[in-house]
């Protein structure tokens, strides 16, 4: 595309790359799943996508409140940051982050029925909490420490939203694009959100690209109401289409499910040990160790051995494994061996 001297930026104007991406996404991704969604290009990053979803949800429902979960991460611009629960991230805002209520995530208090808790907030006239326009969730809290929410929980949130006229927004920025074994991470629960946001891997080759998708009846935007210079990045659209073609041609979804079995078996046999908690799905896994200092030492040791890995979780004590979905089995095993060897040296 670069060698053809194709147009690079077109704002909101229709171009051949934009048309081809939208047609391909509609015909090969949405239609086979029976999904009917409007596709919006909100800007180049995930936080842009979240901002658009929040703005539209509030406009549709004419309510200010949004509910998010404790332990979540949705972005660093002010609207998305108001959802993000991490105090370190929120502290840089410099202003009050209002109109968001944070709900306990289901893993925080196993004895608490958090769906029932939310329903009580909605029905008890002394709860002191306003009805939200939307509830936004990640199906896997990645930055929160790789906590995988159960299908039953996701179904419960969907039912709650339906019952009380609340929009359900899924943040699929980090775990979409087959990361969990299905293209959209919410597919495993058999639910369909009212809106969802994608970025990161949807760019095909590390290109900045984001999508905000919503049911057609929610499309009440006025012209120019949510615009931005880099919404029309043509190279990102070309890369995104090429990435989707590769995923379909190489059956990446099925490969991720197969690799999940390899990773799970390896974890059980080589990584599991006293003081270590393992959790994950597809090709995203968390290995929780005693503290952030140990996790940092393990990450540094892995880096010395040729593996890049970051930390996650409240105390940065979770090793976050996100291997490339297209990694070969040999490459996958090499990375896992590096983690094993590094942990053995330090634990």
Report residues per predicted region:
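Conserved N-terminal phosphate-binding loop of PLP-dependent enzymes in the Aspartate aminotransferase
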Residues: 1-347
């Amino acid at each position: 595309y670069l060698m053809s001297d194709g147009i690079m930026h077109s704002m909101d104007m229709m171009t051949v790359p934009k048309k081809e991406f939208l047609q391909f996404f509609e015909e090969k991704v949405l239609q086979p799943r029976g999904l009917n969604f409007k596709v919006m290009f909100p800007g180049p990053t995930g936080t842009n996508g979240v901002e658009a979803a929040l703005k539209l949800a509030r406009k549709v429902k004419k309510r200010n409140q949004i509910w998010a979960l404790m332990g979540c991460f949705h972005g660093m611009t002010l609207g998305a940051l108001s959802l993000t629960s991490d105090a370190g991230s929120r502290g840089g805002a410099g202003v009050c982050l209002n109109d968001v209520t944070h709900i306990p995530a289901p893993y925080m208090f196993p004895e608490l029925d958090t769906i029932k808790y939310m329903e009580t907030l909605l029905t008890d006239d002394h709860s002191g909490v306003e009805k939200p326009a939307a509830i936004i969730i990640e199906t896997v809290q990645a930055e929160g420490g790789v906590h995988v929410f159960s299908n039953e929980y996701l179904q419960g949130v969907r039912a709650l939203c339906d019952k009380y006229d609340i929009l359900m927004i899924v943040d699929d920025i980090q775990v979409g694009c087959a990361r969990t074994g299905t293209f959209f991470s919410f597919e495993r629960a058999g639910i369909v959100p009212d809106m969802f946001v994608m970025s990161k891997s949807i760019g095909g080759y590390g290109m900045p690209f984001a999508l905000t998708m919503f049911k057609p009846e929610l499309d009440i935007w006025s012209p120019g109401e949510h615009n931005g210079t880099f919404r029309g990045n043509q190279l990102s659209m070309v890369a995104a289409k090429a990435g989707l073609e590769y995923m379909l041609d190489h059956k990446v979804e099925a490969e991720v499910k197969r690799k999940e079995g390899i990773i799970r078996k390896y974890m059980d046999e080589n990584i599991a040990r006293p003081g270590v908690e393992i959790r994950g799905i597809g090709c995203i896994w968390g290995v929780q160790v005693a503290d952030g200092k140990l996790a940092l030492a393990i990450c540094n040791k892995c880096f010395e051995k040729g593996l890049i890995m970051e930390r996650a979780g409240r105390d940065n004590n979770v090793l976050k494994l996100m291997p490339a979905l297209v990694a070969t089995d040999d490459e996958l095993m090499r990375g896992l061996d590096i983690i094993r060897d590094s942990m053995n040296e330090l634990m």
